[in-house]
Amino acid sequence: MSQEVAAFKLVLVGDGGTGKTTFVKRHETGEFVNRYNATLGVEVHPLNFATDCGNIRFDVWDTAGQEKFGGLRDGYYINGQCGIIMFDVTSRITYKNVPNWHRDLVRVCENIPIVLCGNKVDVKERKVKAKTITFHRKKNLQYYDISAKSNYNFEKPFLWLARKLAGNPSLEFVATPALRPAETAIDPEVMQAMQKDLEEANAMPLPDEDDADF
């Protein structure tokens, strides 16, 4: 008798070129099982994780480049149960556009757990520094530095979302997800420095910004 799997629609958004598809395809099941929804121009990647509370599957909706042609259709967001907003830490404009993606997502999905991810932290020319990443704190989202190419923090967004969706803050993954081999590596000292920067940034008071988008 096969074990029942809890499945959730995960909406993945962000500017084109931020590494969304690369990120999803790091997971082996996401690489070889994907369904293309031609109507919406969407690829759906089922990503499976084993937890100490049973198996969970995120059906990750990836835009397949549709965001380059303007906003996404509501059909992309409808019935979304959780979300990841991605930007590129080497491109300030992709972070500047995060509020737009967040607005569109919550307009349709309202109160769903959302993770903000700053991708490409393996690149030395980081433009969006930890201290300038404040949007998640204003909107009560979770934030992670990630690197799709090095697999750095790959499982963190999924673990946080799984805990929220299961209503169990102590839920753990019981097996490391099968990931494609890393294409690059991040020096452990650099990782520690990034983590320290994030912790210090999160401890700072939020700037007084009178900006409707934020």
From Swiss-Prot:
**Region annotation Switch-II: where it falls in the sequence:** 65-81
**Could you tell me which SMART domains the record lists for this protein?**
RAB, RAN, RAS, RHO
> Any keyword Secreted?
no
Gene Ontology terms: cellular component: cytoplasm; nucleus
Keyword Amino-acid biosynthesis attributed: no
Q: Which GO molecular function annotations are given, in alphabetical order?
A: GTP binding; GTPase activity
Xref: InterPro entries: P-loop_NTPase, Ran_GTPase, Small_GTP-bd, Small_GTPase
Top-level taxon of the source organism: Eukaryota
Which residues of the sequence carry a binding annotation for GTP? 15-22, 65, 119-122, 147-149
One Pfam family matching this protein: Ras
Q: Report the principal subcellular site.
A: nucleus
Keywords for this entry? GTP-binding, Nucleotide-binding, Nucleus, Protein transport, Transport
By sequence similarity, the record places it as follows: Belongs to the small GTPase superfamily. Ran family.
* Functional note: GTP-binding protein involved in nucleocytoplasmic transport. Required for the import of protein into the nucleus and also for RNA export. Involved in chromatin condensation and control of cell cycle.
Q: Fill in the subunit field for this protein.
A: Found in a nuclear export complex with RanGTP, exportin and pre-miRNA.
Q: What's the name of the protein?
A: GTP-binding nuclear protein GSP1/Ran
